[in-house]
């Protein structure tokens, strides 16, 4: 299992790319031969079956679209193909499908964007008529920020083009491209991208918030691999930004979240690591004290090539287990050696499961997606700790023994190596010292509730478990947290998440979006908590 790094739907952010307007993008057949300088271009199908689930913020869905301003609709339809402007019907209903079925917000209008021009038209119409704006990329955000009540959604799920430049080692990805789209295209060229652990997460949303993942020890965060971006600003204008052009905006995109515009396409650095040594090791929870103590030293001393996720999740028999998920991105022979740094992790105790070996990165993403399928209800919280001390292990072990659902999990993600080397302030990401990002995931089935009003199985016990665990970790935690997992219910963490970057981020925000058109990812209102 890999807890995916879910990014806030690009509401108030979500990149998009491509310029095809009519209909659905085509999926190309065979990949062209891998030749130096050759460009590999793929356009995935726009509506993968695993994206068809419903949800949003634990609210009832109301027919907000019935009150849509006619002048607003008229402007939208004059600027975009009418069949792409949805206010009701089967296509509109399908467009409401998000990863988290607990979300209940209903937008008034969905525009299925096929180009940057569609995005610009939507932004301008929204501003002209005072309609709240949001952006949907991967739709994986637990908080459901792809939608705003009664608002306009710029749906980028058809903007999933991925173009790989083999010679220069980068990919240009559309704003709606999923992590799996990018990794699959890169693999055909013998390359890979820095992503999180789940393939169904939007690539741009992940990157804008930072992007923890199993390759960060060797290659840094996803945000550290951003080379340039095309951005539609709050006034509807389009800019191309990189380290030399609009450098303040480019800096803000590297971890400042989706606060500055709609990223319609992004160019990201690729790496020649299509195959890794990876797997899952599960230990009985009664061995947790010794295993976590041993892992503490391993995480502190691990080489850049080895990044390890650790945590608790229900095992095959439903009982909680200690979960260890290593990823080795270095020399395969060294990583796969019996006495090497990866396989020794299976000897910390007596595992109930130990599956480790060479695997394509696309397969690791697919495995996480299979463990966390769309359509369940859920909520998330996060903390940041320097290390897993005995006190923290006790808190998390107790929480694991009290799991209220077989679909919940606790995972901490290692932050080390290359990710720690950029100076604080060189990007907008607010923390560069070694640490562990703790992900508390609470998920449960929707039960028999078929109208998607946020009910189904009683959620009170699940949410109580989540909030109590989150609170119990606070005394041992560093200020702030990972912005892609923070929402309106965690304002104190938001205020401390950007550190000394807060003042500069607010200055960029004031320059490019003074009216806060984009606001999905939390941004402090002042430097008071920074």
PLM regions: where:
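Compositionally biased, low-complexity flexible segments
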Residues: 1-37, 44-49
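Soluble FAD-dependent oxygen oxidases
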Residues: 41, 46-530
